[in-house]
Amino acid sequence: MANKGPAYGMSRDVQSKIEKKYDDELEDRLVEWIVAQCGSSVGRPDRGRLGFQVWLKNGIVLSQLVNSLYPDGSKPVKIPDSPPTMVFKQMEQIAQFLKAAEDYGVVKTDMFQTVDLFEAKDMAAVQRTLVALGSLAVTKNDGHYHGDPNWFMKKAQEHKREFSESQLKEGKNIIGLQMGTNKGASQAGMSYGRPRQIIS
């Protein structure tokens, strides 16, 4: 970010549109969830987009978050003893979080790219990823989610139905509505009468 110059023209318009998608209320909810999920040791960021970005930038908080959603002994992300200071180590830590989130079930379309967070290019995408992760945690309901379940929407789950052979045979005798109905007005019993007589 230090080596990036200011954006002009169309680039600035695009960047300002991206920045308008960032939701401050959602940031508050995400911070509350991360603190509830990981414990108060993660601290709290300064309010605003930049404070949120600085808090998550080294990848440690994100790694602790995704690790807290797994049972003990099967933590997917290795967290170093001291927070990484080198740029490539921080980006690698973020990439490990993204891989673990994908393994947890977050779809690729909900994932942010490493530069979206590291260079604060699209913090709204970071929020989308965290919301998707929270929704999955609430949906799985495996006891590892901490916080208010109403913070995230529960995803729809499959409701598989099993039919016996006799039920399937009975279904063959029913006329489906796609085939039309056998009740109501029809041409049954109509008589046509005589043809029209044309005499010149």
UniProtKB/Swiss-Prot annotation:
Where in the cell?
Cytoplasm
Q: What is its main location?
A: cytoplasm
Which branch of life, at top level?
Answer: Eukaryota
The record's InterPro entries line, in alphabetical order, gives:
Calponin-like, Calponin_repeat, CH_dom, CH_dom_sf, SM22_calponin
Residue ranges of the Calponin-like repeats are 175-199
Domain annotation Calponin-homology (CH): ranges: 24-137
Checking Gene3D superfamilies in the record gives: Calponin-like domain
What tissues contain this protein? Gizzard, uterus, intestine, esophagus, aorta, and trace amounts in brain, liver and heart.
Instruction: Enumerate the UniProt keywords alphabetically.
Output: Acetylation, Cytoplasm, Muscle protein
N-acetylalanine found at: 2
Biological function: Actin cross-linking/gelling protein.
Q: What protein am I looking at? A: Transgelin
Which species expresses this protein natively? Gallus gallus (Chicken)
